[in-house]
Amino acid sequence: MDATRAPLAAEPAAAPVSWTHRFEAWTASVCVALLRCLPLDAASALGGFLARLIGPRLRVSDLARRNLRAAFPGLSEPRIDGLVRGMWDNLGRVAAEYPHLRHIRVFDPGSRVETRGTEHLDRALAAGRRVILFGGHLGNWEIAALAAAQYGLDIAQIYRAPNNPLIDRFVARLRGGGSELIPKGTIASRRAVAALRRGGHVSLLADQKLNEGLAVPFFDRPAMTAPALALLASRFDCTVLPARVERLRGARFRLTLYPPLDVPRTGERDADIMAMMTAVNATLEGWIRERPEQWFWVHSRWPD
């Protein structure tokens, strides 16, 4: 069954809150309070330093190294170690930048975010088109959704909620509002459909692992990929815009909107979905190959 036409699901019950969840949330709130005492650039630098120091020693870094070896055959071990350190630097900076997100004004003169390609969005909006923005866990990926909200879009952001419901609510507050947050799960398709029906728009990160979905090439290996983007784009005749965030230096960024991807309409539904998601994965792969140290290599994107 087409996921976007599935029967309406009941709202999931709230996840139970454990003492571990409470401790994690308390720890996060203390860290955020301390980071708020620092200017954004200093907080970002501190987060990067601590993550570079600790991250490469964690067991999960072995997964990052395996993924890098598979994605870039022949890459030397010193180069791989350097990319792992760079990845942790970026992740540490992202974490430390959360307390300051609401103060980043993307489109103000002299902003720390350089923007390119907004004309593609303007053309879609002028034509009355609904828009799906997609990106990946690159640079500080929160910048794209932040920019969309500050641009005045009625946008629903599909995201993977943390396992800790207290952390989920805490991070939602740090994001600063301005967009509807839709956690992935049983009701995500229903809420995304509702957003598009009212004339709104959708943003999502399309690079996460699924246990189900379509096996779509990604770095020359099959990777389970959610077809929701293609289904929604086809059903609502959306303009699909790639939205890339790059970290330039420190806590400065470039947000680039690229020309829209073609939405295949051959009449062969399964083939059209596969073609659309192949184009999405190819776009993400190209960005990652250019700046591999800024991607999230510490998750099992491919089957073992």
Language-model features, listed with the residues they occupy:
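Membrane-anchoring hydrophobic helices of lipid-metabolizing enzymes
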Residues: 2-135, 168, 177-179
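Non-catalytic C-terminal accessory region of glycerolipid acyltransferases
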Residues: 2-19, 81, 85, 125, ...
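Soluble or luminal CAZymes and related metallo-dependent hydrolases
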Residues: 26, 60, 113, 184, ...
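Hydrophobic alpha-helical segments typical of transmembrane helices
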Residues: 30, 42, 64-67, 144, ...
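Active-site metal-coordination segments of metallo-dependent hydrolases
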Residues: 62-63, 160-165, 223-226
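Catalytic core of membrane glycerolipid acyltransferases/transacylases, capturing the structured
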Residues: 93, 127-185, 211-216, 247
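A conditional alpha-helix N-cap/helix-loop micro-motif detector
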Residues: 111-114, 164, 182-186, 222, ...
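Short amphipathic alpha-helical segments and helix-helix/interface helices
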Residues: 121-122, 145, 171-172, 192-193, ...
